[in-house]
Amino acid sequence: ADDPVYDAEGNKLVNRGKYTIVSFSDGAGIDVVATGNENPEDPLSIVKSTRNIMYATSISSEDKTPPQPRNILENMRLKINFATDPHKGDVWSVVDFQPDGQQLKLAGRYPNQVKGAFTIQKGSNTPRTYKLLFCPVGSPCKNIGISTDPEGKKRLVVSYQSDPLVVKFHRHEPE
């Protein structure tokens, strides 16, 4: 059986719980910015934050069959969406851009969105660190890593090549 996923404090991740996803290497959070030819008023790219931003996310099982699982397990098919404003409710998606490859964007804005689900696996030998993966329908899962664009934005991308982004989950404490 797959192991439960734990937050940084050692508690099991709860299905539909709210968590801040933080880079293990430098403590950076996840941000949404405009990249490339996106309208700066409508940022769509999911990136590793270069500013002090910590948006909370909601992580939920894609399995709609009752009873719903109580906890998030490794290798479970997951949906991730932002849980705090200004992007509350916006779902993470993967969009195929040639020749740049697959990038994480807010869902529903692109015709070339890749069907699939996210999943979580152990990220390193350090306890309670994980990597995020994207599993396209009918294909093996690939790591989510970082690709720094010419503007210095650290885009989240789906790749066999890039090192995985290793993260910890912190339970979101509303202010």
From Swiss-Prot:
Keywords: Disulfide bond, Seed storage protein, Storage protein. Disulfide bonds join 135-141. One of its GO terms (molecular function) is nutrient reservoir activity. It comes from the Eukaryota. InterPro entries: Kunitz_inhibitor_STI-like_sf, Prot_inh_Kunz-lg. It holds the Pfam family Kunitz_legume. PANTHER family: KUNITZ TRYPSIN INHIBITOR 2, TRYPSIN INHIBITOR A. Belongs to the protease inhibitor I3 (leguminous Kunitz-type inhibitor) family. 2S seed storage protein. This is Albumin-1. It comes from Psophocarpus tetragonolobus.
